[in-house]
């Protein structure tokens, strides 16, 4: 599952007190009715069927920020999210003299709320539809390149049709490697304002040592407010805008939790790879994640050295540092967790059972052939990914990356809009401009140069087979 779509993670509170549910894990909402009996037995008190409706209560109160999950918690458009999800907006409004990162921020009235960082959005899901048949029609007979181009164009066409309704941002999400496609229509709230963010001493209490750990005693929350035009339509920032009135909002219970209480987290964490093959799992945990962890630690050290504490440059790069530390801790935890549960060994056992099942009946031989072809493609993909990893990093610094994107934009604009690559269509231009605007407050030449030298040296240290010949010239 590749695109950012709605997932639910179900688990039991009081982990030490009793075993986890057999259905622990990440599920799409439409899968929940299938495990309704287990959910009820585990402690869910509402009808599991209601959790499959993303436009009804309670799921309609859960929204996406385009990279984070959030929820409406008032009829006046108040949105609660994680502190780190709003930290970029806190950083954007901070200076060395007026540092909201250190001091926190509170708007005591709506008139005191601050504009969120450029490009900030609240996406409210309004409609879900299955478009699998339309996307996949006739593609099985096509060559791989034709198949890719056909699917890509159909997805763009479906998205464009959906976005003919002004103020909406649409997404075609792919599931199971292109087996299923779902169209998600979302109201795009463009006027987002910062209401409250705790000081880092609260919002980042415990720092990266406590991050991703349990129990955790961090005030990891912040508040935004969503605004729309007086007629309720999506609009850019304006003093005339009014708070968005959501159809549904959540009420926060003051009762707290007891050991064994049922807990379900609903949101947009991105993707899950439950059916990844053994070779892909091994490549992920033996090369990709360890290599990335090493790079992230060097990257963090480079920024901290080039942007000392208390400098204006450190304020500009605080949000990036927080993101890098967050990601490094996450990857390191995944590596440790995979080793602890013997993930590679368990996956090998599962695949051995599958191989035995296929071998037991000659009529199943087609499955074996398909799996062998898939594994071969996975090996090719892993090799290409290593080259892309180092090349992507060496072109990652902000100034060089911005220059590349501007050049690419100029080339893409030579094409009809419908044929441009995603990210360079007219629907993407607002984000493009806002990204350039945000760069102004998140760029320091000396830090950017230090980052680039780190990436360049890492790239040059790789064998020629893992570098890009054209770039080397």
What kind of region is each of these model predictions?
Residues 1-7:
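Bacterial N-terminal signal peptides that target proteins for export
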Residues 2, 16-473:
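Terminal presequence/propeptide segments associated with secretion/organelle targeting
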Residues 8-16:
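Bacterial N-terminal signal peptides
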